[in-house]
From Swiss-Prot:
<keyword id="KW-0687">Ribonucleoprotein</keyword>
<keyword id="KW-0934">Plastid</keyword>
<keyword id="KW-0699">rRNA-binding</keyword>
<dbReference type="GO" id="GO:0009536">
    <property type="term" value="C:plastid"/>
</dbReference>
<dbReference type="GO" id="GO:1990904">
    <property type="term" value="C:ribonucleoprotein complex"/>
</dbReference>
<keyword id="KW-0689">Ribosomal protein</keyword>
<dbReference type="InterPro" id="IPR018102">
    <property type="entry name" value="Ribosomal_uS11_CS"/>
</dbReference>
<dbReference type="GO" id="GO:0005840">
    <property type="term" value="C:ribosome"/>
</dbReference>
<dbReference type="Pfam" id="PF00411">
    <property type="entry name" value="Ribosomal_S11"/>
</dbReference>
<comment type="similarity">
    <text>Belongs to the universal ribosomal protein uS11 family.</text>
</comment>
<dbReference type="GO" id="GO:0019843">
    <property type="term" value="F:rRNA binding"/>
</dbReference>
<dbReference type="InterPro" id="IPR001971">
    <property type="entry name" value="Ribosomal_uS11"/>
</dbReference>
<protein>
    <recommendedName>
        <fullName>Small ribosomal subunit protein uS11c</fullName>
    </recommendedName>
</protein>
<dbReference type="GO" id="GO:0003735">
    <property type="term" value="F:structural constituent of ribosome"/>
</dbReference>
<dbReference type="InterPro" id="IPR019981">
    <property type="entry name" value="Ribosomal_uS11_bac-type"/>
</dbReference>
<dbReference type="GO" id="GO:0006412">
    <property type="term" value="P:translation"/>
</dbReference>
<keyword id="KW-0694">RNA-binding</keyword>
Length: 138
């Protein structure tokens, strides 16, 4: 449970405000979901509770620029910055999807200084399950 810490605010009428105590985590899991249109990076603790997340769309990219590797790199940097502020030092990386931003997001995480213990590709692959949709004709 998160404790609330009383904090005096001298700027606004001297009111006492309650502020959340940020969770300190040393280990975590970084999930990269790279779809064909967007890349979503979610940072969780070991139990799966979300610490931070970012996507190419939330990083300010709109339209077709969301699918670029640079947009994925920016999204990964934004998500990791918040995780480092929470005290994360080492993480596992789970990559899902066929998108263009897979490698760029992983490169950005490697450059961030977090020690990577495990890198897994968890893209769902059918064992000849459902029939795929018909091919697009453009």
């Amino acid at each position: 449970m998160v404790k609330l810490i009383p904090r005096l605010s001298s700027r606004r009428n001297g009111r006492i405000r309650l502020r959340k105590n940020t969770r300190k985590i040393s280990q975590g899991v970084i999930h990269i979901q790279a779809s064909l249109q967007n890349t979503i990076v979610t940072v969780t603790d070991v139990r799966g509770r979300v610490v931070s997340w970012a996507s190419a769309g939330s990083a300010g990219f709109k339209g077709t620029t969301r699918r670029t590797p640079f947009a994925a790199q920016t999204a990964a940097t934004n998500a990791i910055r918040t995780a480092i502020n929470h005290g994360m030092r080492e993480a596992d990386v789970l990559i899902k999807g066929p998108g263009l931003g897979r490698d760029a997001a992983l490169r950005a995480i490697r450059r961030s200084g977090i020690r990577l213990e495990l890198i897994l590709d968890v893209t769902p692959m059918p064992h000849n399950g459902c029939r795929p949709p018909k091919k697009r004709r453009v």
